[in-house]
């Protein structure tokens, strides 16, 4: 468990299950509603627990104390993935140089390939008593801090994520230090998302 300066408590879902048990945990998750993204709801309620057990992704629940009770505000999920960045990606020279330092260039693919932390899910709970207790930027920064802590142990400097091709979403991530570098076609099981591809964004963590 991690408590930051803003009195936000981060708990790994696996730890929460062990402490509170399956029934209380599932009741908590069932009451979560991201409001704007059904995929975020679906992952938390049907996949997060299994992904944690199999070591595919770690999910962190974010709480705060509200009127003497713990209030479930949000969650995020992290995983490790191989990210492919094309050599002709429209990114700055500075970012390209940093990517070159931490990746392998594959001539046949004409791409940089590196193992990187992925923020797979990020969602606020709009069923919370006061949704203003955490902002989207604060939640994103919590996820990035968790990645940075992991990198202190295992190495690495980058984190990436994918989002729908929605201008407001892309602007949000860019304002929070991410840079657009590519697009990925949706998999067959990604049926709750709009469009035919996801926009990929990356950030260098100092």
What positions do the PLM features span?
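Glycine-rich acyl-CoA binding loop
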Residues: 131-143
């Amino acid at each position: 468990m991690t408590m930051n300066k803003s009195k936000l408590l981060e708990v790994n879902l696996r730890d929460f299950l062990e402490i509170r048990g399956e029934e209380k945990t599932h009741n908590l998750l069932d009451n979560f509603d991201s409001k704007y993204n059904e995929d975020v709801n679906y992952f938390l309620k049907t996949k997060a627990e299994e992904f944690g057990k199999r070591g595919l992704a770690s999910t962190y629940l974010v709480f705060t104390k509200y009127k003497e009770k713990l209030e479930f505000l949000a969650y995020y999920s992290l995983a490790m993935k191989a990210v492919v960045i094309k050599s002709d990606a429209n990114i700055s020279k500075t970012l390209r140089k940093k990517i070159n330092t931490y990746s392998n260039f594959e001539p046949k693919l004409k791409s940089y390939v590196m193992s990187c932390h992925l923020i797979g899910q990020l969602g606020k709970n709009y069923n919370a008593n006061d949704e203003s207790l955490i902002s989207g930027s604060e939640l994103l920064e919590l996820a990035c801090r968790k990645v940075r802590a992991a990198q202190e142990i295992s190495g690495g400097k980058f984190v990436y994520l994918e989002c729908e091709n929605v201008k407001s979403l892309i602007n949000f991530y860019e304002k929070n230090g991410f840079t657009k570098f590519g697009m990925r076609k949706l998999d067959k099981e990604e049926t709750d998302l709009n469009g035919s591809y996801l926009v990929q964004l990356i950030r260098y963590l100092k």
